[in-house]
């Protein structure tokens, strides 16, 4: 069994954190060999990588299994698809995004249907994919891990300090709701326009998220689009299918969360009692303002349990075991 590492760089935002964490978790398995072929860069680098990928795939046999990150850039996908059909080895993509579900068009679902097994985000994404492939070929990761090497520092919790943290890509194109008058969030991330906002605390290295571990009764927010009344637009609608990585970021730091009540991850949050599913920002603020410290501490204890699993890679590890066991019978 092989894991294709397609990375050769890091960034301050969390865009590639999930791929790096998957690599680190897969590297712990004695029966999984990591193959390092960067699939990013300029024209020359892509030509070199195409040759390396083709050479590697030529050596695979029908008993071999290749796990890789999805989506994969088109030229490399075409190479992989060609050798997959030719040599009959098995391929298992770990889905990070499906462009057609966030208004990007394309035919990701058709490509995924050609795979031998697929690692999906959650039941809602699986339901969508099952229109194109057999559901028994789809495994859910439930939530992305967020590996953190150190323990979470103790956070002083008092009812004198309470607030909501929003982290990620702060571009107006993606989350213009944060620029709405009256939205009083503590902000972390890139592409923020109002740098003089005292509640904008800059960006941080995705590998070291301790900066968001602020004192008080703090929550993380999962919300996208241009409205405070609902999640709207392509990015807002995408929450109905995907697992936003910022959810794992917040939980890794033991922060309970607020999430849109129509988001695919809402059931996970509510079922594990690690936050609230809300229909509007106003509803969220009412909960924050009225919450007792006893209630917050109870939710925080639940969050610590999930946080430990996320920080140590339990969710990808569990779904990897499912994939390995299932492929043994095929």
Swiss-Prot record:
CC per GO annotation: cytoplasm
GO biological process: lipopolysaccharide biosynthetic process
Keyword Ion transport attached: no
Main location: cytoplasm
EC class of the enzyme, as a word: transferase
Keyword tRNA-binding: no
EC number: 2.4.1.-
A GO MF term: lipopolysaccharide-1,6-galactosyltransferase activity
Gene3D superfamilies named among the record's database cross-references: Glycogen Phosphorylase B
Pathway as given in its UniProt record: Bacterial outer membrane biogenesis; lipopolysaccharide biosynthesis
Keywords: Cytoplasm, Lipopolysaccharide biosynthesis, Transferase
Location of this chain's protein in the cell: Cytoplasm
Protein function: Involved in the transfer of galactofuranose (Galf) onto an alpha-D-gluco-configured acceptor substrate to form a beta-1,6-linkage. It uses n-octyl alpha-D-glucopyranoside as an acceptor substrate for the addition of galactofuranose from the donor substrate UDP-galactofuranose. It is not able to use beta-D-glucopyranoside isomers.
Designated name of the protein: Beta-1,6-galactofuranosyltransferase WbbI
Provenance organism: Escherichia coli (strain K12)
Gene field: wbbI
């Amino acid at each position: 069994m092989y894991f294709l590492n397609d990375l050769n760089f890091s960034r301050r935002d969390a865009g590639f954190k999930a791929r790096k964490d998957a690599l680190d978790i897969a590297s712990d398995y004695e029966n999984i060999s990591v193959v390092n072929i960067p699939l990013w860069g300029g024209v020359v680098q892509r030509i070199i990588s195409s040759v390396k990928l083709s050479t590697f795939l030529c050596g695979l046999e029908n008993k071999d299994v290749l796990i890789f990150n999805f989506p994969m850039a088109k030229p490399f996908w075409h190479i992989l698809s060609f050798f997959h059909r030719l040599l009959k080895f098995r391929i298992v993509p770990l889905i990070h995004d499906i462009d057609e579900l966030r208004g990007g068009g394309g035919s990701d679902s058709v490509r995924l249907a050609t795979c031998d097994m697929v690692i999906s985000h959650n039941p809602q994404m699986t339901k969508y994919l099952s229109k194109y492939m057999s559901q028994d070929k789809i495994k859910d990761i439930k939530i992305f891990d967020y590996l953190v090497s150190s323990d979470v520092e103790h956070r002083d919790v008092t009812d004198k300090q309470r607030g909501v943290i929003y982290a990620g890509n702060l571009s107006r194109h993606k989350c213009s709701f944060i620029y709405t008058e009256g939205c009083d969030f503590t902000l972390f991330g890139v592409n923020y326009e109002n740098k003089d906002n005292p509640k904008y605390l800059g960006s941080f290295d995705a590998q070291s998220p301790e900066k968001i571990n602020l004192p008080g009764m703090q929550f993380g927010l999962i919300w996208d689009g241009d409205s405070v009344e609902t999640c709207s637009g392509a990015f807002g609608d995408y929450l109905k299918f995907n697992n936003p990585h910022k959810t794992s970021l917040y939980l890794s730091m033991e922060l309970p969360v607020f999430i849109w009540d129509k988001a695919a991850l809402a059931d996970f949050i509510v079922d594990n009692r690690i936050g609230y599913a809300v229909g509007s920002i106003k509803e969220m603020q009412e909960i924050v303002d009225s919450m007792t410290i006893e209630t917050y501490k109870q939710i925080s204890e639940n969050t610590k349990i999930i946080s430990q699993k996320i920080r140590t890679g339990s969710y990808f590890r569990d779904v990897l075991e499912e994939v390995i066991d299932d492929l043994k019978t095929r």
